[in-house]
Amino acid sequence: MDRGLSTGTHIGDDGLRERFQASQSDSSLGAGALTAAGEVEAKDGTSQNKKTFGRTPDGTVFTVPQTHDMVSQLLSPSEPKNLSDVIVLAILGAHILLLWWLPDFAKIPVFAVIYLFWRAAYNAGIGWLLHNQSHHKTLVRWAEKTRIFVNPSTNQNPHPKLYNLLKRELETKIPTDYSFEEAPIEYNTWLVFRRLVDLILMCDFTSYCLFAIACSHHPVGESMLMTVSRWSAGIVLVLFNLWVKLDAHRVVKDYAWYWGDFFYLIDQELTFDGVFEMAPHPMYSVGYAGYYGISLMAASYKVLFISIIAHAAQFAFLVFVENPHIDKTYNPPPPRKRMTEQDSVSTSSQATEPSVASASTDEPLPQATTPPSGPPPSVHNLLGFNNLDLYRITDTSSILIQLLVFALTVLTPSTPRYQFLFVANAAVWRLVFSVGIGYLLTEQSDCKAWTRHFLKYGETPNEAWNQWKGTYHLSMIMCYASFIAAVWKMYTLPADWGYGLVLLRHVLGAGLISLQIWTSASIYESLGEFGWFYGDFFFEGAHKLTYNGIYRFLNNPERVLGLAGVWGAVLITSSGAITFLALLSHILSLAFIQFVERPHMQKLYGRSLRQDAGLVKSLKRTLPPTLRQLHGSVDKIFDDSFEFIEELIDTARPKLAAGVNTFVKDTTALFQKYPARVTITRIDEDLAGLDSRDYALEIEGTDSSSLEERGDLKNLVFEYGSPIKVKWTAPLNHSKKDWVSLYRVTDNTSREVSRVSSQGRWVATNEGFYDNLTCEKGIITSDIVTENSEHRDVATGEVIFSGDKLFWTQGVFEFRYHHNGKHNVMAISRPFEIRIRRFDEESFEDNQASVEKSLLPVVRNCFDRDPEIAPETVEEQFGSLVERDGKFAKRVVFAVHQMFGIEFAPEVVRADGTVRNLAWRICNAKRVLAPYSMTRDGATTPTEAHEKDEAFTKARVTAMIRRRTRRDSKSAGRRESQLTIHENVVLRYRAWTPFKRIEYMEGSAKPGNSSHPLPVPIPRQAIQNERRGGKKALTQVRHNKQADADNADNNDVACLSRTPQPSSLERLPSSRGKKRA
């Protein structure tokens, strides 16, 4: 990649160091990863020479020859030159001549466009190639399809001249340990890709420097001291950038510099030194210091802004290209924990014990037998826009407070009086946030004062923890909201943006604010909710210190970088009051770390605390031995200041990744909601001679238990998420680029052409004819010659749709067979339905075992039946990939909602971790929601016959109650009271109809399968409405014979079950003659 100051080189090295870090964290894992990757190392016992061996994806082992960096290959006279070198040097020379030839007014815009073109070619072009190579092996497949590396002597290479040219070019560059004919295709493809990278990166850096030259000038009125300082700082940054690049290349060599692990894997010692110990992703962070040094020397805002654009584009390259490949290649999810025989025995013994889960709604998870010593699993996090929940009082209060502060800030004038009030308010809230919270944490650390307060009133430690998180969050919101309000009051728009350093101050201030946001995001990413809210002050346990993320390089990043934003506000406002607030904030934050955090950490972790961070160690190693002994405060301040610069980019990556990922997800959702429509108006010429009757599709899947038959055909209803096998039939001369896709029946109105994008839900019929591998996932067999019903030979094959190639919803779908990579439809399958069977609520008697039995196959389908993540039993833990990829939990949440009518958040599925825990949660939710299940749809909906029976019974009971009330009650108040009690019984009849049988006694009721007491209080308006309805029912009853009415008065009254029979009436003791309460 880039040498010297070039911008992009950093990627490969940086990403590789990140991978090494992940592997080095566990030596056994690292060794296993190397062994699994086939990385072999052979050393000569008599010399220091070491040969490197690589392994291709198909297992081929080969010797990786030694190569040289780009700059030395191009510019060193000792290195052999070839045609590609001449072309690159000629293009670079053309750039220089263009700068000399262009007139002055055209130099800046022309070279701005040229540089942006090469930057786009780097970040977008190379990024697209590497992304497809990582996911689909696109570059290697291109080489296989064109056969450019096949020896022409075999008569299989259609480009013999190109073959000879490539052979001469590559062997000239690598004179030893390399044979063009014997090298694997992956390595040769990588060598050709390197030449393209050399061209793009050299042109990228050269055009940037020429653009800076075109923009450079000497500011009018600048003093000599300022000029010397500007150039000195710029030269230092450029030299530092040069050292970063050279040291990075020394560590990772050309293999990672040119993204070699996208093509093959080699042996690589897990070294972690040099620049990679100073900063994360140094090629993306400090590796761009030279750009800002050149901006200083050019004294041009144009160069500064285009440098910022280039830097941001490089971070996007890291987020979308490097990091996904790193995670896929070097950080696969750990294997799922399998249940041992002892665990299964203990689990089964627990299952045989009497279950009391159905009798209590406050019981914890089934496995819990002792109070938890640690915090509850973080399911509903507090921080982040994604976790905003207006049903939660903390979130609602935070929004209302911010709206109130905003309204007061905007609606009040910016007079000195109001400015003083807002600054004083910000200072008070900073004192509350630092001193007040610090005092509470100190008391909690010493004597658990916060937890004891809640225990005194019968609450649990978990409740104390939740209340603490809300208190800390609200105080933090008020602290920063009041500070922003004070900044708003003290800020005035500049009259002239070009005057002095006004624009520079705003740019630097915005950069510092962004730095604090990135720092906070990185700290939260490393610590999580538990660490962010100081969870180790509240829960004691075997806590283990881990220095990952930003803490790998800094011990206390919030000490400097965490307050960068307040100093950015100082730069933007140039206000003494804001400077006072910034100093106050910084002093209080340092005091908080020194007097609150540090004592608790020393008490909790003792000698396991790290003394020096990675950056400090690296700086100490560069000092002479005499200076290494000095550990004064001056050294600390210097180290912390240097760490500030290092942490800038470290914290930038995760925040930028989160923001860009959110943007991509939103855009993807829009495209899915409004899919692009492709209209094909002409029929391909190669369709001539093909008969669509020779094509056919048959589908097989896991039948749902709710199959229906209509006429002679049985409706095709498949289980949610189950793989669907498609058998296709085509003529022997069918195109090898045919493909089968899955659509909703309503997606396409035409049966000749598919006009809607398949959105990735398609599988090719034959392997090796597309440039990606995703479309080949699912191919079982291809071009099996069989005889059809007309005794003609046809080609058949099978493909299977599973995972992301399915629709994870309910509906009616169809498969379509398309011709030659186009959208012409040759065959359409029978429509089939994907349905989630509704759980039978009549058999739902808090029977957790039945819920587990119904839920297990659904969960396995949602997890793609992958043995690494899908559980085999209800007790088995979910695989760790469920935690990483949220799509699996979302599938389960949708299925649970459709099956049981209970809506969970995806975090609940990840937190439960087993089918048994999830089933328990469903049962518990059903018990809690049982009193509110008076719906007119679903399994509990009464039929028309039931409603008639209910109306008849209700009328008889109401009439009897009114007669008793008139005879026995002597006052209107007592009549109304008694009527309320008995009408409660009548009104509650519908609520309990889902149960098998419900008996009602005087003034109380006890459902046969519910622990909820009845009657439930009913509003007076409902009683009045029922009273009016009772009068109508009474009128109907009066038409009956008086004898029947008297008989009903003396008889007991009972409520009927769902299918009432004459024998199902049970007698209640008559209330006549009894004393009424």
Swiss-Prot record:
It is found in: Endoplasmic reticulum membrane. One of its GO terms (cellular component) is endoplasmic reticulum membrane. Signal peptide: none annotated. It is an enzyme of class 2 (transferase). This is Phosphatidylethanolamine N-methyltransferase. The lineage of its organism: Eukaryota, Fungi, Dikarya, Ascomycota, Pezizomycotina. Residues 330-378, 1027-1077 are annotated as: Disordered. The keyword Nucleotide-binding does not apply. It is a multi-pass membrane protein. Its EC number is 2.1.1.17. It comes from the Eukaryota. Belongs to the class VI-like SAM-binding methyltransferase superfamily. CHO2 family. One of its GO terms (molecular function) is phosphatidylethanolamine N-methyltransferase activity.
